[in-house]
Swiss-Prot record:
This is 4,4'-diapolycopen-4-al dehydrogenase. Belongs to the carotenoid/retinoid oxidoreductase family. CrtN subfamily. It comes from the Bacteria. The keyword Oxidoreductase applies. One of its GO terms (molecular function) is oxidoreductase activity. GO terms for biological process: carotenoid biosynthetic process. Keywords: Carotenoid biosynthesis, Oxidoreductase. The active site is at residue 208.
């Protein structure tokens, strides 16, 4: 049985490896000259830094799925980050997150007294909800909608407080607004508004403490080389600079892909691209029309430095004076943030391979609106203000240390095919989560499947990998059912 995969992002790569292990003949088509999608490096003058994802979450899920795909633990190295990260507030206070719950309680007692009991209760409640959510949502596909609307699932949704926002749900645990920011900003990892995203996404901040934060040595994007080598060694046919233009259909099934103007036939097809765009390859009569809300975007600054800030944490957040105002500017008024929060990533503290000897790299991310009319080419002043904040609050002498600099904006992301320039797929709103999110079987076509950040269960590298795993299970199930009926998957 032949399977054609359109797109070489992480979802496409994991899908290809898993399907090949099951004995299928797999071809993968990638429009760019490299694989990996959002997992990529920016490299220049001997400096190398991750272009997109940097924080490795859910390490057990990541390693388990890689193992299922044939990637052994000795092919990559995960480094535990502890402290997890440090948050700096405009009033001069700070909050450091730790792996150790006991150390975290002490941190809260010392800096935000009165919130420690709430933290203990938060961790207890979230552990129960995490296990529920993992079992009922992360590990299940809802392409058959009936499997979602069960009494058990509805009870779980209520238990997960899906009807509340992340920010509002945290008011039951923390009196101090700064602590609530520290446990709600994680929705921005997947492009969601903490003031609006369902409370089930509070589980991200819980997971940081419970499962830890890790760094993949060499950079997160170094995983792509490992996966690509595995693809080639396993016999997957990989074609780069191969643009998939559309899906050719015959009745209720797909018959072929048009790739660089040529017809490529297969028995089943996988779409691995930002789904609002990828879905346009499917004829309208087979793909119900739908309006999507894009995730937030970001302005990214990459620096090559002539030094390493040895006392710096790997991850830091420099919070603005009004977090709620920043969120309003991103998600409602769609304007350039006036006093934004900034995430900084300085991996050279633990990885000397990213820059010339004695030098370092620095990455800064500012959440900004997607789908806005902002002319990012005219926002040099905004970039300079971000650099000023980094220098004043965390990296003294930064400007003098810069040897190389690069800036990426929502315009770059939109040019690369990301929906409205959003960085994380479609937004994790209530009605774009769970059963309401595009599923692994997203259309009326019985042999077309999908993987990626906009597909259930959502964004973030391990979660996209989990979505690919669910999608492969759907293909296997369909194939087995068809074999029992005595016909091939393509009829």
């Amino acid at each position: 049985m032949k399977i054609a995969i359109a797109g070489g992002g992480i979802g496409g790569l994991i899908s290809a490896l898993m399907l090949r292990k099951k004995g299928y003949e797999v071809s993968l088509f990638e429009k760019r000259d490299r694989l990996g999608g959002r997992l990529a490096f920016t490299e220049e003058q001997g400096y190398r830094i991750d272009e997109g994802p940097t924080i490795v979450l859910l390490p057990e899920m990541l390693t388990s799925i890689l193992n299922e795909a044939g990637i052994s633990r000795d092919q990559y190295e995960l480094i535990n980050i502890n402290p997890l990260y440090k948050l700096h507030f405009k009033d001069g206070s700070s909050y450091t997150k730790y792996n150790s719950i006991e150390r975290q309680i002490q941190e809260i007692k010392e800096n935000f007294p009165g919130n420690e009991e709430g933290f203990v209760q938060f961790m207890k409640d979230m552990e129960i909800r995490f296990n529920l959510g993992k079992d009922q949502f992360l590990e299940k596909s809802f392409h058959d909608k009936r499997t979602f609307w069960t009494r058990n699932n509805l009870k779980t949704l209520v238990h997960l407080k899906a009807y509340k926002s992340v920010n509002n749900s945290l008011k039951a645990y923390f009196q101090d607004e700064r602590i609530r920011q520290a446990y709600s900003l994680q929705t921005l990892y997947i492009g969601g508004n903490p003031l609006d995203s369902p409370a089930l996404y509070s589980l991200i901040s819980f997971s940081e403490h419970k499962h830890g934060i890790y760094y993949l040595k060499g950079g997160y994007a170094s995983l792509v080389t490992v996966l690509e080598n595995a693809l080639l060694n396993s016999g997957v046919k990989v074609m780069k600079n191969a643009t998939v233009e559309r899906v050719v259909t015959e009745g209720e099934q797909a018959a072929a892909l048009i790739v660089n103007g040529e017809e490529v036939k297969a028995d089943a097809f996988v779409l691995n691209g930002d789904f609002p765009g990828a879905s346009k390859m499917i004829p309208k009569e087979s793909m119900p029309a739908r309006n999507y809300t894009a995730s937030s975007s970001c302005v990214l600054l990459y620096f090559g430095l002539d030094k390493v800030y040895r006392d710096s944490p790997v991850h830091q957040f420099f919070m603005g004076s009004n977090f709620q105002q920043h969120m309003k500017e991103i998600f409602e008024t769609k304007e350039v943030p006036s006093d934004p929060s900034i995430y900084a990533f300085h991996p050279s503290v633990i990885d000397s391979s990213l820059a010339p000897e004695g030098h370092g790299v620095l990455y800064a991310l500012v959440p900004v609106p997607s789908g806005s009319p902002i002319n990012w080419g005219e926002q040099e002043g905004f970039v300079e203000k971000v650099i000023d904040q980094l220098e004043e609050r965390g990296f003294p002498g930064l400007r003098k240390s810069i040897q190389w600099k690069k800036v990426r904006t929502p315009d770059d992301k939109e040019m690369e095919g990301l929906f409205q320039g959003g960085s994380f797929g479609i937004a994790p709103t209530l009605f774009q989560s769970g059963v309401f999110r595009p599923q692994v079987k997203p259309s009326k076509l019985t042999n077309v499947y999908a993987a990626g950040a906009s597909i259930h269960p959502g964004g973030g590298i391990p979660i996209v990998m989990q979505g690919a795993k669910l999608m492969v299970s759907a293909i296997l199930s369909d194939h087995q059912n068809k074999e029992r009926e005595g016909v091939s998957l393509s009829g």
